[in-house]
From Swiss-Prot:
GO BP term (any one): system development
Similarity-based family: Belongs to the TRAFAC class myosin-kinesin ATPase superfamily. Myosin family.
Domain Myosin motor, residue spans: 85-779
Residue ranges, annotated region (Hinge): 812-839
MF-aspect GO terms: actin filament binding; ATP binding; calmodulin binding; microfilament motor activity
Function comment: Muscle contraction.
Residue numbers of N6,N6,N6-trimethyllysine PTMs: 129
The protein, known as: Myosin heavy chain, fast skeletal muscle
Organism the protein comes from: Cyprinus carpio (Common carp)
Primary localization class, coarse: cytoplasm
Residues in IQ domain copies: 782-811
Length: 1935
């Protein structure tokens, strides 16, 4: 395409292709192919350079920047010639390598040519700027052009897909992949834009809009779907401001003519986690920030949101604005798109509400309840907003979040949630709502885009994330990478299929390679059974599965077994990885943390159930199918694993499978998007980043595949034309030669590798690089040719110039000669005459020419006029022809349209014809059936008449019964009137209750359901009527009778409908009556709750009030239990409704609700009553309507009865139905009567209960009045005791809490003691049973001895039989010798054979004798070993039973041999049996399967040797082979059992690890409890300080009362003595406890001895193994409880220690204040009181600790005993195994001897005939069966040994733990004793200080008395002086 052709692209041309001048300049650039190379560089990855030298595998290159580097030869890559610079298809390059691809993309990107082809790929680089390459001009430029005709562009890919679809009639797909920010979404938009434009152009004008369907054209809708999907599916990421966080597959459907028909969208892998979490440089989905722009203020109010994103933490964790995005404009586009796509106004506001609710979810807060782990809401404001937006009840939602109901077994249980669990549930719900809403919007968009226009083909556009390799790769990355792996496999397969199809078409020999299989290992590792996804889904099924167990399963299954699965190498600074996968793009390390939770994606089912009942229709629709999916997994998906739910991975695989199926059914086109740099800088390309993407997105993979084949190809003509210069002599001149032959000759004559090219039918194919070499050779040849041509041309030019010079010289010579001659003759006279005549001759000729020209002119003028006239005529004809042509074109277009319409109509007619034919056939068949039935029914007509009369009688009975029901209804109506009057008096209390509205709505809904049921009945009758009208021809003879019957039945129906109405009214009355009674109960309950609140407020006043309140609470609980009992009774009544018929089901439900109305149906008021009346009126109106409908039906029936002649069959069915209805009505009436009676009884019971409740409430009122009076009395006491009670009440609570804890501990220990006693009793019973078993075993041993003696006797008989056999052998020998003399020469050979056999028999008999002797020794040795084995009673027991069976078989065999066979053969048979039984014992003990196989192979070889001598043994060998096969099967079975045992052992180890993790969790909880106790103790210390300050104030106020201090001193002395006495008692108790512990140890030792005896019975121990496991678990639980109680005791001790320190501090303060005696004495008294309380507490703690120590010692000793017994058993098993090993070695020798004897015996036995051989074979099979049984028993024994070994290890570990616990308890007791001693010493010191203070006190008191005496003396003196002064004054006055 030249520059002129590129002008059609307008301004975009310069961004699409280089100009011709640039291309020519590039080709003329100097280039040396031998030295131009790319070189590896650590900074830039690759650099251009010039090769300097190559030596020893090293290459020296000088880069263009002047730097010289030396690298390995494989680190340099050849450059392509300049003609390939900026090449549009990189697959055409000569040298296909990474740097060539990189620099080609880089140079094109620098010129802003962002699109480049790479084989089948179109690679696009993000320009980060706007380029004018998407205008309408560009769309038109690409339309209809082939790929090679236009520059690379996304429009070219789109147009090719469109044209392929039209020409090939095949669906197409465009696969667009790349990393985030690479431009996938933009290119997807451009593809859709192109299809929308082209599809709209190819069709006629826009169709008429369908009313109510959509707004805007289909093209507008397809384009408008993007803004909505982007708002809800796009977000800002680190690399991209508008990153699609989901994959999508958009199908654009076209009609047959290429017209755009419809579209639909499928989405994949929406990133839900972004809703609740964003990185710092990212933000959540655009819609959240668009809503908060404030563009629509009414939305802010409707959604209860603000314009500040930081008010919503869930969406403001990262950035909140994006520079490149205007949220206001985007919001306008989103809102407009919703309207264009046809969403209704309700749906639109629902979408916004749910979006706002998701934002509010992040503001919900929860806190932990005090002293509990249970979460509770921290405020309900946010919950109220969410509930409003989602159409829920906020209280129900919070309850469901904090207390969800879960299914445990078959019951629903309420479960408490912690704060983290609730927060996780809230996050999961918000993500689920957002995801479901997004998927619903996609479905709605698809519905709107489905225009119902005819569509034939589609083009799919896949926009999905590319391969991802991050530092932290999780499940999402695995899904994305797996998707890309599948897509790359699809591409590889498709690409090389196309390549190889071309090879096949061109006839090139090529072995097919499926490059899709290159990725099979990784794909199968992920998706096949026992792959990663399979194991992940399997782990999700197990409730106790963890990430660790998942990792272990992965490693066990694949590590070391699958090459693609590797163990990651730990790297510094990177996240931990658990496994690595080898993908086509590289090895990726995956972290599996949280995969199980992500895969299960759990939701709070309680909240989901609320969603399903939401008043917001969209939300209810989103979760409508959630319950069904959770319960059954869907009907169609029942085959899936688990069945109960569908995991994320399973759903992902299902969607991926559908996607791949879609893609495989299409012709794909591939687009790969690249990010040039991380900084979003236009024009900059980072080499490392681009190469990484090229590897990830498969471009380099495609190049790799290209290099496998022949990527370069040229047509033969082009090749011949271009490369003919290489050897022109091969192609002869002047004669025709085929281009292919010429190319073959040309290539054959050139010095190149002839394996690097192939010849096709039309092209020659080259391997990568060969074409470049040919180009180099051509350049060199052209250089030589040009040089030669230049030389030839120069020579030719010079020769031509020389010739011209010579000719010029000759001309000059000739001119000079002529001029000289003229000068000589010009003056001659004749010459002058010639000069005069010459002009005259010329003028005459001119006149003649002029005359001729005039004639020509006239002639031409006439021709011109004729031509003009003819031209005019032709023009007129042309105009008319053009007009006709246009008319014909219009007719052709109209005819083509008519033809297409006719074809469509023809197709429709054909389809309708087929359907009508099928219907006709069905109708004919049905007509035949109806005729047969009619013939039968004419005979049954008379029976119908009789039955109709019976029906009339039954209807009369029904009328009587209904009359009774109507009377009862009037009675209930009167009751209702009375009850409604009582309801009016209680309106005020009823007004407070708001829940009645919901109940009323439910009742209304039920009434509507009743109405619907009646309408269904009417519909049923209508259908029956239509059937009757269709079947009317055969009933004309019985018209009147059938008419009367129908009228009677209709009357009965009307009566029944009236009864139904009456029954419904009676139900309503009963409901009102019940509600009134329940209302009273509710009122009383409300009063009770008020009383309870008052009583709880006054609980702190004293123990008496608390007791009374507890009594009231107990009474209330009794009342609640009675209410619950009443509810249970009502539930029982409800169950009785299940037996009613289907048509009266609604009536029975109402009756049951009357018997079981819930508490929500209590309060009724006048408004509700009015609604009830309205409902009744509606019901009456509906009944009237039904009656009118029924009357209309009857009228229609009466009109159509005249035509009912031929339909006797239908009447028969009607009769049967009526009979059924009659029986049902009878049953219903009986049930109604019984239900009415039951309701009446229930009503009477309820009234009685109400009266009793009222009496009880009146009693409670009186009691509450008394309580109030007592409270008033106590208020006065409270004022006096406020200060003391405030302090001591807290202490009392603490002590009570401590006492309750100690009491619980004591109860727990008591239960443990009882359990231990019970276990001891069980062990004693087991011991007795074992003793009995020992006795029976001894008895069996005696029997075995007797059997052994009998066996010795049998052995002697065998020896006698053997001697007899020897004599018989001698006789046979002599007999054969004599016969040999008499026989002829023909039998000579047979005689020799028999003699040889006799000799062999003698040798075998001798060997048998020696083996018998050795067997006897073996038996003696085995007897000694049997006596040794008698120690193990259990093994001896089983062995005795086995030997008993074998002995009986042995006796039978002996008897048969005595009767039928020679005694020598009997001896051999017995030896054989005994040898085989010994070998089975050996197999049993050692599980030696391999030796058994060797043994059988030896048998097979020896039998083959015998076959050479005796041909009759062939059958026996076959049987032996079969037995070997069976034994091999047995071996495989045992090996499978072994693997099962191994898996069981691994599961047990996993369980042990799980239990250890539980112990760690318990210890962590204990630490938390300990910290909590420390905190509480700190609070108690503060309270102690407060008490101390209060005591100080009291002391200051009592300084004046010295006498009371004396009394207090005496009290202190008494307290001291009491404390000393208590301490002595505690010491005595401690010594008693120690003695009791010693006694318990003795008892434990006795029990240990008993248990040792009991453990001798092995079978009993095996049966008790499970019990022991349970005991271990119980011991562990008890240990955990003990540890918790020990921590509590420690906390209490620490508290006591703090109290002691406080006391010491107070004593120091007292010593400092020597002058304040009263305060010091008082503090000492307080300290003594506190110490006394502490001592009492310590005494209780010591008792508990001692008890704990006893229990722990008992457990430890029991565990030690168990461990010792298990160790002893293990040792015995080991001894037994060693003993059996020795037996095995001895028996191996014996087995070999016996085997030899067996072979010889078999050879002898063959002489006895085939009959004997068959018996031997049957015996062999029996023995082989015994071998298998013994092998199974051996395997069981090995299992038992392993179990006991594990048990010994567990008990040893438990023993060590118990020992540690005992040591800790002993240390605790010692510490307590030390503390008691310290307290004693402190008391003595306090006593000494008290004495010192008393002495000082006495001294001061004595000084005070002296001062008082001095004061008295002074006072007396003063009085005297006053008296004197008064006397003196009086004397003065008198004077």
């Amino acid at each position: 395409m030249g520059d002129g052709e590129m002008e059609c692209f307008g301004p975009a041309a310069v961004y699409l292709r280089k100009t011709e001048r640039e291309r020519i300049e590039a080709q003329n650039t100097p280039f040396d192919a031998k030295t131009a190379f790319f070189v590896v560089d650590p900074d830039e990855m690759y650099l251009k350079g010039t090769l300097v030298s190559k030596e020893g595998g090293k290459a020296t290159v000088k880069t263009h920047s002047g730097k010289t580097v030396t690298v390995k030869e494989d680190e340099i890559f050849p450059m392509n010639p300049p003609k390939f610079d900026k090449i549009e298809d990189m697959a055409m390059m000569t040298h296909l390598n990474e740097p060539a691809v990189l620099f080609n993309l880089k140079e094109r990107y620098a010129a802003w040519m962002i699109y480049t082809y790479s084989g089948l790929f179109c690679v696009t680089v993000n320009p980060y700027k706007w380029l004018p390459v998407y205008d309408a001009v560009v769309v038109g430029g690409y339309r209809g052009k082939k790929r090679i005709e236009a520059p690379p562009h996304i429009f070219s890919i789109s147009d090719n897909a469109y044209q392929f679809m039209l020409t090939d009639r095949e669906n197409q797909s465009v696969l667009i992949t790349g990393e985030s920010g690479a431009g996938k979404t933009v290119n997807t938009k451009r593809v859709i834009q192109y299809f929308a434009t082209v599809g709209a152009m190819s069709g006629p004008k826009k169709p008429e809009p369908v009313p109510g369907k959509m707004q805007g054209s289909l093209e507008d809708q397809i384009v408008a779907a993007n803004p909505l999907l982007e708002a809800y599916g796009n977000a800002k990421t680190v690399r991209n401001d508008n990153s699609s966080r989901f994959g999508k597959f958009i199908r654009i459907h076209f009609g047959t003519t290429g017209k755009l028909a419809s579209a639909d969208i499928e989405t994949y892998l929406l990133e839900k986690s972004r809703v609740t979490f964003q990185l710092s440089a990212e933000r959540s989905y655009h819609i959240f920030y668009q809503l908060m722009t404030g563009h629509k203020p009414e939305l802010l109010e409707a959604l209860l949101i603000t314009t500040n994103p930081y008010d919503y933490p869930m969406i403001s964790q990262g950035e909140i604005t994006v520079k490149s995005i205007n949220d206001v404009e985007e919001f306008i586009a989103t809102d407009t798109a919703i309207d264009i796509l046809g969403f209704t106004a309700d749906e639109k506001i629902s979408i916004y509400k749910l979006t706002g609710a998701v934002m509010h979810h992040g503001n919900m807060k929860f806190k932990q309840k005090q002293r509990e782990e249970q979460a509770e809401p921290d405020g309900t404001e946010v919950a109220d907003k969410i509930a409003y937006l989602m159409g829920l009840n906020s209280a129900d939602m919070l309850k469901a979040l904090c207390f969800p109901r879960v299914k445990v077994g078959n019951e629903m249980v309420t479960k408490g949630q912690t704060v983290p669990q609730v927060n996780n549930a809230v996050s999961a719900l918000s993500k689920s709502v957002y995801e479901k809403m997004f998927l619903w919007m996609v479905i709605r968009i698809n519905e709107m885009l489905d225009t119902k226009q005819p569509r034939q083909f589609f083009i799919g556009v896949l926009d999905i994330a590319g391969f991802e390799i991050f530092d932290f790769n999780s499940l999402e990355q695995l899904c994305i990478n797996f998707t890309n792996e599948k897509l790359q496999q699809f591409f590889n397969h498709h690409m090389f299929v196309l390549e190889q199809e071309e090879y096949k078409k061109e006839g090139i020999e090529w072995e097919f390679i499926d490059f899709g299989m290159d990725l099979a290992a990784c794909i199968e590792l992920i998706e096949k059974p026992m792959g990663i996804f399979s194991i992940l889904e399997e782990e999700c099924m197990f409730p106790k599965a963890t990430d660790t167990s998942f990792k272990n399963k992965l490693h066990d299954q694949h590590l070391g077994k699958t090459a693609a699965f590797q163990k990651p190498k730990p790297a510094k600074g990177k996240a931990e990885a658990h496994f690595s996968l080898v993908h086509y793009a590289g090895t990726v390390d995956y972290n599996i943390v949280g995969w199980l939770d992500k895969n299960k994606d759990p939701l709070n089912d309680s909240v989901v159930q609320l969603y399903q009942k939401s008043s917001l229709k969209v939300l209810a629709f989103l979760y409508a199918t959630h319950g069904a999916e959770a319960e059954g997994g869907g009907g169609k998906k029942g085959k899936k694993k688990g069945g109960s739910f569908q995991t994320v991975s399973a759903l992902f695989r299902e969607n991926l499978g559908k996607l791949m199926t879609n893609l495989r059914s299409t012709h794909p086109h591939f687009v790969r998007c690249l990010i040039p740099n991380e900084s979003k800088t236009p024009g900059l390309m980072e080499n490392y980043l681009v190469i990484h993407q090229l590897r990830c997105n498969g471009v380099l993979e495609g190049i790799r595949i290209c290099r496998k084949g022949f990527p370069s190809r040229i047509l033969y003509g082009d090749f011949k034309q271009r490369y003919k210069v290489l050897n022109a002599s091969v192609i002869p001149e002047g004669q025709f030669i085929d281009n292919k032959k010429a190319s073959e000759k040309l290539l054959g004559s050139i010095d190149v590798d002839h394996t690097q090219y192939k010849f096709g039918h039309t092209k020659v194919f080259f391997k990568a690089g060969l074409l470049g070499a040919l180009e180099e050779m051509r350049d060199e040849k052209l250089a030589l040719l040009v040089t030669m041509t230049q030389a030839l041309c120069r020579g030719y030019v010079m020769r031509k110039e020389f010739v011209k010079m010579m000719e010029r010289r000759e001309s000059i010579y000739s001119i000079q000669y002529n001029i000289r001659s003229f000068m000589n003759v010009k003056h001659w006279p004749w010459m002058k005459l010639y000069f005069k005549i010459k002009p005259l001759l010329k003028s005459a000729e001119t006149e003649k020419e002029m005359a001729a020209m005039k004639e020509n002119y006239e002639k031409m003028k006439e021709d011109l006029t004729k031509a003009l006239a003819k031209k005019k005529e032709l023009e007129e004809k042309m105009v008319s022809l053009l007009q006709e042509k246009n008319d014909l074109q219009l007719q052709v277009t109209a005819e083509s349209e008519n033809l297409s319409d006719a074809e469509e109509r023809c197709e429709g007619l054909i389809k309708s014809k087929i359907q009508l034919e099928a219907k006709l056939k069905e109708t004919n068949e049905r007509l035949e059936d109806e005729e047969e039935i009619n013939a039968e029914l004419t005979a049954k007509k008379r029976k119908l008449e009789d039955e109709c009369s019976e029906l009339k009688k039954d209807i009369d009975d029904l009328e009587l019964t209904l009359a009774k029901v109507e009377k009862e209804k009037h009675a209930t109506e009167n009751k209702v009137k009375n009850l409604t009057e009582e309801m009016a008096s209680q309106d005020e209390s009823i007004a407070k209750l708001t829940k009645e509205k919901k109940a009323l709505q439910e009742a209304h809904q039920q009434t509507l359901d009743d109405l619907q049921a009646e309408e269904d009945k009417v519909n049923t009758l209508t259908k029956a009527k239509t059937k009757l009208e269709q079947q009317v021809d055969d009933l004309e003879g019985s018209l009147e009778q059938e008419k009367k019957l129908r009228m009677d039945l209709e009357r009965a129906k009307r009566k029944l409908e009236g009864d139904l109405k009456l029954a419904q009214e009676s139900i309503m009355d009963l409901e009102n009556e019940k509600q009134q009674s329940d209302e009273k109960i509710k009122k009383k309950d409300f009063e009770i709750s008020q009383l309870l609140s008052k009583i709880e407020d006054e609980q702190s006043l004293g123990a008496q009030l608390q007791k009374k309140i507890k009594e009231l609470q107990a009474r209330i609980e009794e009342l609640e239990e009675e209410i619950e009992a009443e509810r249970a009774a009502r539930a029982k009544v409800e169950k009785q409704r299940a037996d009613l018929s289907r048509e009266l089901e609604e009536i029975s439900e109402r009756l049951e609700e009357a018997g079981g109305a819930t508490a929500a149906q209590i309060e009724m008021n006048k408004k509700r009553e009015a609604e009830f009346q309205k409902m009744r009126r509606d019901l009456e109106e509906s009944t009237l309507q039904h009656e009118a409908t029924a009357a209309a039906l009857r009228k229609e029936q009466a009109d159509s009865v005249a035509e009912l002649g031929e339909q006797i069959d239908n009447l028969q069915r009607v009769k049967q139905k009526l009979e059924k209805e009659k029986s049902e009505y009878k049953m219903e009436i009986d049930d109604l009567t019984s239900n009415m009676e039951a309701v009446a009884k229930a009503k009477a019971n309820l009234e009685k209960m109400c009266r009793t409740l009222e009496d009880q409430l009146s009693e409670i009122k009186t009691k509450s009045d008394e309580n109030v009076r007592q409270l008033n009395d106590m208020n006065a006491q409270r004022a006096r005791l406020q200060t003391e009670n405030g302090e001591f009440s807290r202490q009392l609570e603490e002590k009570e809490a401590l006492v309750s804890q100690l009491t619980r501990g004591k109860q727990a220990y008591t239960q443990q003691i009882e359990e231990l006693k019970r276990h001891i009793e069980e062990e004693v019973k087991a011991k007795n049973a074992l003793a009995h078993a020992v006795q029976s075993a001894r008895h069996d041993c005696d029997l075995l001895r007797e059997q052994y003696e009998e066996e010795q006797e049998a052995k002697a008989e065998l020896q006698r039989g053997m001697s007899k056999a020897n004599s018989e052998v001698a006789q046979w020998r002599t007999k054969y010798e004599t016969d040999a003399i008499q026989r002829t020469e023909e039998l000579e050979e047979a005689k020799k054979k028999l003699a040889q056999r006799l000799q062999d028999a003698e040798e075998s008999i001798e060997a048998v004798n020696s083996k018998c002797a050795s067997l006897e020794k073996t038996k003696q040795r085995l007897q000694g070993e049997v006596e040794d084995l008698m120690i193990d009673v259990e093994r001896a027991n089983s062995l005795a039973a086995n030997l008993d069976k074998k002995q009986r078989n042995f006796d039978k065999v002996l008897a048969e041999w005595k009767q039928k066979y020679e005694e020598s053969q009997a001896e051999l048979e017995g030896a054989q049996k005994e040898a085989r039984s010994l070998s089975t014992e050996l197999f049993k003990m050692k599980n030696s399967y391999e030796e058994a196989l060797d043994h059988l192979e030896t048998l097979k070889r020896e039998n083959k040797n015998l076959q050479q001598e005796i041909s009759d043994l062939t059958e026996q060998l076959g049987e032996t082979g079969k037995s070997i096969h069976e034994l091999e099967k047995a071996k495989k079975t045992v090996e499978s059992e072994k693997s099962e045992i191994q898996t069981a052992l691994e599961e047990a180890e996993g369980t042990l690890e799980h239990e250890e993790s539980k112990i760690l969790r318990v210890q962590l909880e204990l630490n938390q409890v300990k910290s909590e106790i420390d905190r509480k103790l700190a609070e108690k210390d503060e309270e102690m300080e407060q008490i101390k300050r209060n005591s100080q104030r009291v002391i200051d106020s009592m300084q004046s009362t010295l006498d009371s201090e004396v009394r207090s001193r005496n009290d202190a002395l008494r307290v001291k003595k009491k404390m000393e006495g208590d301490l002595n008692e505690m010491e005595i108790q401690l010594s008693h406890a120690n003695r009791q512990a010693a006694e318990a140890q003795k008892q434990l030792r006795n029990v240990q001895g008993q248990l040792k005896d009991a453990q001798l019975h092995l079978d009993e121990a095996v049966r008790g193994q499970e019990d022991m496991k349970e005991q271990v678990a119980m011991v562990e639980r008890r240990n955990s409880l003990m540890q918790a109680e020990i921590e509590e005791l420690r906390a209490a001790l620490e508290q006591t220690e703090r109290g002691r320190k406080v006391a010491e501090q107070e004593l120091v303060d007292a010593s400092e204040r020597v002058g304040l005696l009263h305060s010091q004495n008082t503090s000492l008294i307080n300290t003594k009181k506190k110490l006394e309380a502490d001592l009492v507490q310590v005494q209780g703690e010591v008792d508990d600790a001692v008890q704990e120590a006893r229990n722990a010692e008992e457990k430890a000793k029991k565990a030690i005993t168990d461990a010792a017994m298990m160790a002893e058993e293990l040792k015995k098993e080991q001894d037994t195994s060693a003993h059996l090993e020795r037996m095995k070695k001895n028996l191996e020798v014996t087995v070999k001897d016996l085997q030899h004897r067996l072979d010889e015996a078999e050879s002898l036995a063959m002489k006895g005939g085939k009959k004997q051989l068959q018996k031997l074979e049957s015996r062999v099979r029996e023995l082989e069966a015994e071998v298998e049984a013994e092998q199974r028993r051996g395997a069981d024994a090995v299992k038992g040994v392993r179990k006991y070994e594990r048990r010994v290890k567990e008990l040893t570990y438990q023993t060590e733990e118990d020992k540690k616990n005992v040591i800790r308890l002993q240390d605790l007791v010692d510490k307590l004793q030390l503390k008691v001693k310290v307290y004693k010493r402190q008391a003595e010191e306090a006593e000494e200080q008290t004495n010192t203070h008393l002495s000082r006190y006495r001294k001061v008191q004595h000084e005070l008395e002296e001062a008082q005496e001095r004061a008295d003396v002074a006072e007396s003196q003063v009085n005297k002086l006053r008296a004197k002064s008064r006397d003196a004054g009086k004397s003065k006055d008198e004077e």
